[in-house]
Regions:
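Membrane-proximal helix-turn-helix segments that form the acceptor-binding/catalytic region
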Residues: 27, 85, 89, 108, ...
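A short, well-ordered alpha-helix in the C-terminal region of glycosyltransferases
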Residues: 358, 365-380, 392
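Conserved acidic donor-binding segment of nucleotide-sugar-dependent glycosyltransferases
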Residues: 341-349, 358-364
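Nucleotide-sugar-dependent
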Residues: 19, 228, 285-290, 297-319, ...
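Nucleotide-activated donor-binding/catalytic signature segment of Leloir-type glycosyltransferases, i.e.
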Residues: 254, 261-288
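Carbohydrate-associated surface elements
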Residues: 172, 194
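N-terminal subdomain of nucleotide-sugar transferases
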Residues: 1-46, 50-57, 193
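Conserved donor-binding/catalytic core segment of Leloir-type glycosyltransferases
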Residues: 8, 167, 209-238, 252
Length: 404
């Protein structure tokens, strides 16, 4: 099949192929006839400067040191931008490209695209995060309107002004692109982030050993950063274990992030070390074993300017495994889980504990919600239902496939 064109993907958040959404997008475009190149940072176990995986050429650069303050974050973004520009020039010389497709954060890759647009290259902005809202949610409401916040808004505007096409992860983000970004609606497409039905064709069997000697298991999957609410879950666990006297439940928290060590210390300070197990990052097969065994899965992301508008991938993975969910009552949580979750009053940790306990004590409700979530995933929320929208977006940019 003749190539429909060449796409260069830029990302800074995770190495490829670890970033699952990006990898599904790239393989979908490859299967549709595009030649795919990608640039990303290195990360264990993907540390080769160049390799080709499943027909996708990947260039990687060494990651910068972990950032801890505004100056170090600024240096991290500049370092990654310069590395990405260097490799973009190398890709242009070696393979060429017609389209630059960049995922944020950060909102800086538009400046690379702007250098190539005079030469006929087009730019697709894949809007993964609301960076201005992320900054305020992470560092507090007092940061709204400060110089860094205003700078992030300006960088975001650069994305919207430069983009020939915007891909949003949900309708809330699409509204931001059309409203704050002033992008014409016909150039903004919603491509959601559900996991693939192929990956979750079956649900793994329950592994009772993961409950660590107790009859019930509560699980969390995801990033552990200040805005992710894992501290809310730990304080809800303290209510269940110490206030409610529950000795029949274990908690397994899967993932890592900036707050990982701080959260382990908080768990110990709350007297939960016997009940809470932190796994760190683990292979997909082990993640799926934990989720398949969990009696309740929790999405404790608190209400803030970012989370209320964001789709949480953890909810979709819980649904794929047929698990009942407890979450705070946020706009996009309700869109994703619908009737498959119990919703706690936003940011009320005691109500979060109450909703978890309600599910722990009602096996029939757990079963109904789990069946609902599995069915909803298979029938409407899996990646396969979003793949076609990505390809439709590219048809508006590059024209339909000659085989269509």
């Amino acid at each position: 099949m003749a190539s429909r064109g060449s796409v260069l993907h830029l990302s800074e958040n995770l190495p490829l192929p670890f970033d699952r959404r990006v990898w599904m997008e790239l393989t979908a475009l490859r299967d549709a006839g595009f030649t795919i190149s990608a640039i990303c940072p290195m990360g264990e176990p993907w540390t080769k400067p160049y390799e080709e995986i499943d027909g996708i050429a990947i260039w990687r650069y060494p990651p910068p040191p972990l950032a801890s303050g505004f100056a170090s974050y600024a240096w991290e973004f500049l370092y990654c931008w310069l590395q990405t520009l260097r490799l973009s020039i190398a890709v242009l010389a070696r393979r060429g490209f017609d389209v630059i497709h960049a995922a944020n954060p950060p909102d800086t890759f538009w400046a690379i695209a702007a250098l190539f647009k005079p030469f006929g290259k087009r730019y697709v902005f894949d809007h993964h995060d609301l960076c201005p809202e992320l900054y305020v949610s992470r560092f507090g409401p007092a940061k709204a309107g400060t110089l860094p916040h205003r700078a992030l808004l300006q960088l975001e505007q650069g994305q919207f002004r430069t983009a020939d096409l915007v891909i949003s992860t949900n309708e809330s983000y699409r509204g931001i692109a059309i409203g704050r970004g002033r992008v014409p609606p016909e150039r903004v497409f919603v491509v959601r982030s559900g996991p693939s039905r192929e990956r979750f064709a079956t649900v793994r069997p329950v592994d009772e050993s993961l409950k660590r000697g107790r009859p019930l298991l509560v699980a969390y999957l995801g990033v552990m950063a200040p805005q992710d609410g894992v501290d809310h879950l730990l304080r809800a666990a303290r209510v269940l274990v110490h206030d409610r006297g529950r000795r029949d439940v274990s908690f397994t928290l899967v993932g890592a992030g900036d707050s990982f060590e701080e959260l382990k210390a908080l768990s110990a300070a709350l007297g939960l070390s016997e009940f809470v197990h932190f796994t760190g990052r683990i292979p997909d097969a082990d993640v799926e074993r934990v989720l398949a065994t969990a009696d309740v899965c929790v999405c404790p992301d608190p209400k803030n300017p970012l989370n209320d508008l964001s789709t949480m991938n953890k909810i979709l993975e819980y649904m794929a495994c047929g698990r009942p969910i407890v979450a705070y009552d946020l706009r996009e949580h309700r869109f994703s889980a619908a009737d498959g979750a119990l919703y706690a009053t936003p940011n009320d940790e005691r109500d979060l504990a109450r909703q978890i306990e309600r599910l722990l004590d009602d096996p029939a409700l757990r079963a109904r919600m789990g069946e609902y979530n599995r069915r909803r995933f298979l029938e409407s929320m899996a990646w396969e239902f979003n793949r076609s929208e990505l390809l439709r977006a590219y048809e508006t940019l590059c024209g339909p496939s000659k085989n269509a």
